[in-house]
């Protein structure tokens, strides 16, 4: 276990989510549908492809906490992998059960994923590889979803049995391309994955922003 990460990020994360009311699944679904019905696309979603990666700067307390600890040039707090389903787009990502009623890797609509972020604070990037390879990235993400990988409340990047958001992307990318893309930041005796790594245009093309 990483001794500094756990009493800082992980502990504060628990304090924040413990203050949140437990979600009612029925109410959550109703709110989700309502938000989807009123959100209008502000850019051409049709240009998106399987395996694109979406990043955002959330506005919640945990997002603010993550932004503070990562202290990156472009403040970001959450990410996921886009999958195309007929004419709609979904995002596979990992998040704590306290926010959605589902623990760990899960799927939601792209519009709902972005509903708590401003478009100017959101990014969509695409790995500079053939679509056939990016479809493998999508397949890896779906595999983690089907295996119901739990959320990593310890924020321990050495533990591959559970993922927090960027850890999920990290494993999907590494298992697809056999390459490390995330830079890491030392925090005490531990390390954190830096989301700005995915904005490196050497490896990723920016589709949004």
Language-model-derived ranges and their functions:
Residues 111-120, 127-149:
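A structural motif
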Residues 48, 74, 128-135, 159-164:
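Soluble non-cytosolic domains of exported or imported proteins
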Residues 20-24, 153-209:
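Activation targets extended, charge/polar-rich intrinsically disordered C-terminal tails
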């Amino acid at each position: 276990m990483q001794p500094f990460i756990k009493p800082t990020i992980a502990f504060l994360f628990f304090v924040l989510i413990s203050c949140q009311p437990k979600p009612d699944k029925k109410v959550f679904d109703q709110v989700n549908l309502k938000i989807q019905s009123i959100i209008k696309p502000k850019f051409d979603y049709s240009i998106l492809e399987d395996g694109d990666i979406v990043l955002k700067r959330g506005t919640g307390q945990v997002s603010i906490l993550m932004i503070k600890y990562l202290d990156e040039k472009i403040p970001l707090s959450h990410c996921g992998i886009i999958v195309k389903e007929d004419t709609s787009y979904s995002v596979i990502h990992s998040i704590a059960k306290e926010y959605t009623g589902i623990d760990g890797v899960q799927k939601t609509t792209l519009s709902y994923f972005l509903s708590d972020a401003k478009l100017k604070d959101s990014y969509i990037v695409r790995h500079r590889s053939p679509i056939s390879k990016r479809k493998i990235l999508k397949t890896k993400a779906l595999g983690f979803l089907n295996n119901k990988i739990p959320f990593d409340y310890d924020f321990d990047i050495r533990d591959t049995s559970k993922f927090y958001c960027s850890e999920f992307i990290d494993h999907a990318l590494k298992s697809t391309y056999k390459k490390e893309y995330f830079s890491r930041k030392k925090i005490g005796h531990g390390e954190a994955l830096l989301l700005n790594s995915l904005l490196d245009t050497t490896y990723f093309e920016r589709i949004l922003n």
